[in-house]
């Protein structure tokens, strides 16, 4: 399956053959894409939320008032969950939110996400992702030629330092090496830009 290669000026400079089993899957499995995104987002959660239980709240252990004769409901501690300033019952604790997902499913998710973008016409192959200087304004002018609101840029094994520095201050533009290609960023950005090297490495990786 052939597609055109574009320059950073959004001009056609050649053709490249893409593996249809990676970039043009016939039936897009949105359920697999969602599974992988849920796995990614859960793994990214810090899990450092914490509330104090009765045993952790600072305060006296003295009984608030005598058991009988006051007309109040009996109380054993000022730190109980029903008391103002007391502990919290069944509150969040520090934990990992990460879940398990088979590598095969993760791989399928990436394939289906790439195929979905290609089917939408929003996966573009760029001949080179290298800049002469790390100028943000220069890169903004380049990206404006693609008329997109957000860009996920995937380079080969290494990212060009000038491109990376220029993209740092551009809203909704992310550049990663091929190892950083992930379903969440592919789906949440409008356009996916792949270098020729990224195409070759991804085809080898996802074969």
UniProtKB/Swiss-Prot annotation:
Recorded GO MF terms: rRNA binding; structural constituent of ribosome
Annotated segments matching region Disordered: 50-76
Gene3D superfamilies (UniProt xref): 3.40.1370.10
Biological process according to GO: translation
Signal peptide positions on this chain: none
GO cellular component: ribonucleoprotein complex; ribosome
Keywords of the record: Ribonucleoprotein, Ribosomal protein, RNA-binding, rRNA-binding
InterPro entries, A to Z: Ribosomal_uL4 (IPR002136), Ribosomal_uL4-like (IPR013005), Ribosomal_uL4_dom_sf (IPR023574)
Database matches in SUPFAM superfamilies: Ribosomal protein L4
A family per Pfam: Ribosomal_L4
RNA-binding in keyword set: yes
Protein's job: One of the primary rRNA binding proteins, this protein initially binds near the 5'-end of the 23S rRNA. It is important during the early stages of 50S assembly. It makes multiple contacts with different domains of the 23S rRNA in the assembled 50S subunit and ribosome.
Subunit structure: Part of the 50S ribosomal subunit.
Family statement drawn from the similarity comment of this UniProt entry: Belongs to the universal ribosomal protein uL4 family.
Protein name: Large ribosomal subunit protein uL4
Organism (species): Rickettsia canadensis (strain McKiel)
Gene that this polypeptide is encoded by: rplD
């Amino acid at each position: 399956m052939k597609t055109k290669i574009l320059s950073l000026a959004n001009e056609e400079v050649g053709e490249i053959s893409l593996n249809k089993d990676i970039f043009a899957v016939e039936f897009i499995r949105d359920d697999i894409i969602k599974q992988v995104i849920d796995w990614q987002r859960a793994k990214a959660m810090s899990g450092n939320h914490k509330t104090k239980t009765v045993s952790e709240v600072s305060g006296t252990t003295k009984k608030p008032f005598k058991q009988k004769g006051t007309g109040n409901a009996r109380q054993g501690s000022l730190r109980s969950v029903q008391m103002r300033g007391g502990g919290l019952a069944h509150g969040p604790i520090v934990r990992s939110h990460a879940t398990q997902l088979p590598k095969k499913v993760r791989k399928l998710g990436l394939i289906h996400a790439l195929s979905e973008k290609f089917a939408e016409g929003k996966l573009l192959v760029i001949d080179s992702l290298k800049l002469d200087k790390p100028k943000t304004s220069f890169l903004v002018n380049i990206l404006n030629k693609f008329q997109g609101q957000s860009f996920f840029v995937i380079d080969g094994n290494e990212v060009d330092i000038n491109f990376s520095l220029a993209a740092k201050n551009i809203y909704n533009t992310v550049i990663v090496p091929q190892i950083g290609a992930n379903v969440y960023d592919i789906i949440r950005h409008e356009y996916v830009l792949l270098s020729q090297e990224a195409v070759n490495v991804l085809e080898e990786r996802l074969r």
